[in-house]
Amino acid sequence: MEKILKLDTVDRYNELFGLETLHPLVGVVDLSKATKFPTHFTLNYGLYALFLKETKCGDIRYGKQIYDYQEGTVTSFAPGQVVETEITDGIKLSAHGILFHPDLIKGTSLGKNIKQYSFFSYASNEALHLSEEEKEIFLDCLKKISIELSHPIDNYSKCLISKNIELLLDYCMRF
C-alpha cells in the first residue's frame, strides 16, 4: 500500500514539487516552476487548496471516484480530504493555485464563513469550469496575494492575505 503523505504545511507541498516557500501559512503555486515531478502520490490535506488546472495531466482520485476535471478548471480540497493523484509521465505541469492553513484564517471573516464555500465539501468531486474571463479574474486574485507574500510579514499581512483569499473564493462561488 502506498504511503499517504500528511499535507499539513505549505512547506510540505512545496517540498513535494520543489517550490519556494515564502510564508508558513499560505502559498501561491505555479506548477510550471516545479523542480520536482512526482508521478503518483496520495495526500491527506491539512490545508485548504484551490488549483486552476491549465492542462489535464492525469487522474485525481477523490475517495473511490475520479475527480471530474479538464483543462481550464478549478479543483478544490479541504482539511481532512484524502486525494490520490496520478500524473501522466512526460506531461508538463501547468496549474496555478493557492494553499492556506486553517490557522491563517482564524479570527477573520473568512474563518467565520469558510463553511459557506460549498466547493470545499467532501461530497463535491466536480471541478469548476471557467471561461477565459473567469480565468483572468482567478489569476489576478492570485497575483495580488503573491505580491503581498513578497513583502515582509507585518501587522497588515494576515488581514490583506485573508481578504484577498476571501475575494477569490467569492468569485469562485459566483462562477
Model-derived regions, located:
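Conserved hydrophobic/aromatic beta-strand scaffold that supports enzyme active sites
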Residues: 28, 74-76, 97-99
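A cytosolic small-molecule/anion-sensing beta-strand core signal
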Residues: 54, 70, 79
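Histidine-centered metal-chelating micro-motifs
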Residues: 75, 79-85, 105-106
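A hydrophobic/aromatic-rich effector-binding and dimerization subdomain
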Residues: 16, 20, 86-150
